[in-house]
Amino acid sequence: YCVVEQSQMERAIQNILVNAIRYSPSGELIRIALSETHGTIRGEIENTGVRVPDDAIPHLFEAFYRADISRNRNTGGTGLGLYIVHKIMKMHHAKYGISNTSNGVRFWFELPCRQPIDNSI
């Protein structure tokens, strides 16, 4: 199992999903994947559509930063969503990042988990 602050983790995942939807063409699918390996939960949320300029990726988790993407003119937002994700992931000692794919963007995180409690003792 993973120990998380539920409301904070819900907020982080919601912010990631909102961005994935916001920057995908209407009707496109959002891919969500979760897996567990060696006590770590890995999550990936991937969209198709607008890719992020490579020079903007290191700044996406900064407060009020918005990449120079023409679609930004048509989308709402304050530039705080990924900054909030950054703070919540750091709080949970998670590794995380964003990368471009061949046809979109992938957000990933690796959340360290504790070993399950042995109730047989």
Residue spans of the language-model regions?
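Conserved micro-motifs of the catalytic ATP-binding
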Residues: Y1-V4
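A residue-level detector for a conserved hydrophobic packing site
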Residues: M9-E10
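Short helix-loop "hinge" at the ATP-lid/N-box region of the Bergerat-fold HATPase_c
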Residues: A20-I21
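Short beta-strand/loop element within the Bergerat-fold HATPase_c
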Residues: G27-G39
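Short conserved segment of the HATPase_c
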Residues: V52-F64
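Short alpha-helical Gxxx[C/S/T] motif in the catalytic ATP-binding
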Residues: G76, G81, V85
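Glycine-rich ATP-binding loops of the HATPase_c
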Residues: H93-S99
